[in-house]
Amino acid sequence: MKRLVGGAALLVAVAIGGAYLNPYNIYDAAAEAGKSYVGSKACASCHEEEYENFIKYSKKAHSFHSVQLMRKELTSSELKECFHCHTTGYGKPGGFISEKQTPDLKNLGCETCHGPGSAHVDSEDASDILGKVDKDSCKACHNTDRVRAFRYKPMLYAGAH
């Protein structure tokens, strides 16, 4: 019995520790619940104005361009590290894999902040997607090591909200 309890405690500790070791692990729980990434174009049919503004005004919507500019100077592992903050869902079930395999996820999109959208697209139920996003959700990529001066509200509204 002690061995069983000890094993279970170790498993929980490893799972919790893994979440803290991977700061990009925000939406894994949602993906494990059967939700997958569908790409921002899937949002456009119901959220046309938000989508058009996002594509037109948000730098996030074109974030993969930065990766392409630096690609020649990066090792394979450095390039993959860029994918965490410059693509949608990289390293998560159904997320970005490569430009060829998942071209609709190669930039940051709606699901970067709102989580995997498949269930919401299918049901059109607001409870199937993360509606309100807070500043803490942004910290995995927008931190002092990466962004000199992160200003949440201007960035939020520049993201078409």
Functional labels for PLM-detected ranges:
Residues 17-134, 150-161:
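Sequence context of c-type cytochrome heme-c attachment sites
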Residues 1-4:
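Positively charged n-region of N-terminal signal peptides that target proteins for export
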